[in-house]
Regions:
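C-terminal and inter-domain tail/linker signature
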Residues: 2-270
């Protein structure tokens, strides 16, 4: 992680989010976002854009729960902060959910004072796995499920419920398998196979900031290791390593029908 003062300021901006969540300080949490900020939680669901929508998101998913952030690693790359973590969410019925997650915060300078604000928050976690965990938690889990539905409908409306459930769609296990195939091909220095796994105009980066050519990427990521793969929407996030460096990788699949199942973007953050 960069040790420059500006990187420290970016990280402090991001760390204010779990602090406000833990304190149940809605005004502070909502105020961390830029004027037209957005929350994608989970990635693949309909984003919550603007103060009113973010406020309703807080009322639905944060206010009724006790949420603890267990952060394992932070990476600052350009104006983005990536977090590798597990979230422990205790619902009103007492059931606690353990949710493996990667977070990406895109930060901007916003307002007359050019204060650092969160422009976009992307939460990569698996909605299907969370629902399975909740339903498998016995009577407390079933009761929590029964309460969550009306909460969603009250705060988000029918369209909001449908937008949230969009998070159930996506690349799932097939996407995670494709990412593992990419890592294996890179490790074998099998550039032809790497090429078949990427869409023709794939965006590649070894640091989440600078674009890399296919040759540069294949050479620089030849020892890429991937772990903790999470499928969210059309993306897979992963804990990645190169040598002794640990970071977060974001793998975005193409929506181009001419290149089905290929990766449109591979961004590695260290």
């Amino acid at each position: 992680m960069s040790s420059t003062p500006f990187a420290d300021e970016l990280l402090a901006t991001v760390q204010a989010s779990p602090a406000a969540v833990g304190a149940h300080d809605k005004d502070t949490w909502v105020g961390l976002f830029a004027t037209y900020g957005q929350v994608n939680d989970p990635v693949g669901s309909r984003p919550h854009i603007g103060e009113a929508a973010i406020s309703k998101f807080y009322d639905t998913f944060i206010a009724p729960n006790t949420i603890v952030f267990e952060v394992e690693n932070d990476v600052v790359a350009g104006m983005s902060v990536l977090r590798d973590l597990t979230i422990h969410t205790t619902m009103s019925t007492g059931v606690t959910m353990r949710i493996p997650m990667h977070l990406r915060y895109d930060v901007v300078e916003d307002g007359p004072a050019s204060s650092l604000k969160i422009d976009r928050l992307f939460a990569y976690w698996e909605l299907r796995a969370m629902i399975s965990q909740l339903l498998g938690a016995g009577s407390d889990g079933l009761l929590a499920s029964a309460k969550l539905g009306p909460q969603l409908l009250k705060n988000q409306g029918l369209n909001g419920v449908l937008g949230f459930m969009r998070g159930l769609k996506g690349v799932h296990d097939a996407g995670k398998q494709r990412v593992q195939e990419l890592a294996a091909a890179l490790g074998a220095r099998d550039v032809p196979t790497v090429t078949t796994l990427l869409s023709p105009e794939a965006s590649l980066s070894l640091d989440g900031v600078s674009e890399a050519s296919l040759a540069e990427f294949a050479s620089g990521a030849s020892s890429l290791g991937v772990d903790k793969l999470l499928a969210a929407g059309s993306s897979v996030s992963a804990t990645v390593c190169l040598g002794d460096r640990r970071g977060v990788g974001l793998f975005e699949f193409s929506d181009n029908s001419a290149a089905p199942g290929t990766l449109a973007s591979v961004q590695l953050y260290f």
